Amino acid sequence: MVVIRLARGGAKNRPFYNIVVTDSRNRRDGRFIERVGFYNPVAAEGSERIRLNSDRLAYWTGVGAQVSDAVAKLLKQQAA
């Protein structure tokens, strides 16, 4: 099954997450099919906190990719 989920990057105590499309059997930070955005929870005041390529996100959900709970929460937060 193909899922859209967060892959952690960054450093200790400085998390940075890539929003990726991957096979559900792959590791959290392992191989992925496509990167569709990022989420920076510790972004500075003037910098971008979340970016999503909505066209690619719509494509992948259209072909049956499941969205993880964390990514669904980010989508809802960005829409508001």
UniProtKB/Swiss-Prot annotation:
Cellular component terms (Gene Ontology): cytoplasm; small ribosomal subunit
GO MF: structural constituent of ribosome
Keyword Ion transport among record annotations: no
GO annotation terms (biological process): translation
UniProt cross-references to PROSITE patterns, sorted A to Z: RIBOSOMAL_S16 (PS00732)
Record key words, sorted: Ribonucleoprotein, Ribosomal protein
Pfam families: Ribosomal_S16
InterPro entries xrefs: Ribosomal_bS16 (IPR000307), Ribosomal_bS16_CS (IPR020592), Ribosomal_bS16_dom_sf (IPR023803)
NCBIfam families in the record: S16
Family designation: Belongs to the bacterial ribosomal protein bS16 family.
PANTHER family xrefs: 30S RIBOSOMAL PROTEIN S16, SMALL RIBOSOMAL SUBUNIT PROTEIN BS16M
Name of the protein in its database record: Small ribosomal subunit protein bS16
Taxonomy of the source species: Bacteria, Pseudomonadati, Pseudomonadota, Betaproteobacteria, Neisseriales
